[in-house]
């Protein structure tokens, strides 16, 4: 029995180390393709202003490809347009979670942080969005997209936009 203790502790240590690293979601390529088709159909429905159909299609797409923050944002937008604010908030929070998870997988990609800023702003958490933006600017000072976003005061412009006000909470 005492011979198994070191093996047990080794196994626990290995499992702990393996569990600490962020992993990509287990989504098959078939699921991603099906979600892309659903999103395409939803975009067509949006162009026809059939928001109810678009919302249903986006809900199916996010169920298949739950790690795609952009799809969650689209779902939240449709739900706001349909007057389903609590459901929209859940979708926007899922978008934020997806963007945060993507940042953990690829911390050197500044665009993912800018998407988090957008999701925070949609949720009405503007102070958090500004704090994150300052942090991103410090982490990625040479990135042209970050520089343009900050120097162009795009967050402020976005917050003043009538369209953004329609879809934000």
Language-model segments: what does each one mean?
Residues 25, 130-169:
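Terminal, low-structured helical/coil segments at or just beyond the last alpha-helical repeat
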Residues 31-60, 64:
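Alpha-helical segment of the N-proximal tetratricopeptide repeat
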């Amino acid at each position: 029995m005492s011979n198994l203790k070191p093996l047990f502790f080794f196994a626990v240590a290995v499992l702990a180390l393996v569990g600490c690293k962020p992993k990509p979601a287990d989504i098959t390529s078939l699921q991603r393709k099906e979600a892309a088709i659903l999103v395409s159909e939803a975009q067509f429905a949006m162009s026809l202003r059939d928001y109810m159909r678009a919302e249903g299609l986006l809900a199916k797409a996010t169920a298949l490809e739950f790690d795609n923050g952009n799809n969650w944002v689209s779902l939240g937008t449709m739900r706001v347009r349909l007057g389903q604010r609590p459901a929209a908030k859940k979708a926007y929070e899922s978008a934020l979670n997806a963007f945060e998870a993507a940042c953990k997988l690829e911390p050197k990609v500044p665009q993912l942080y800018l998407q988090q800023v957008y999701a925070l702003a949609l949720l009405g958490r503007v102070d958090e969005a500004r704090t994150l933006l300052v942090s991103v600017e410090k982490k990625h000072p040479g990135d042209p997209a970050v520089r343009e976003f900050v120097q162009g005061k795009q967050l402020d412009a976005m917050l003043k936009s009538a369209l953004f006000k329609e879809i934000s909470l």
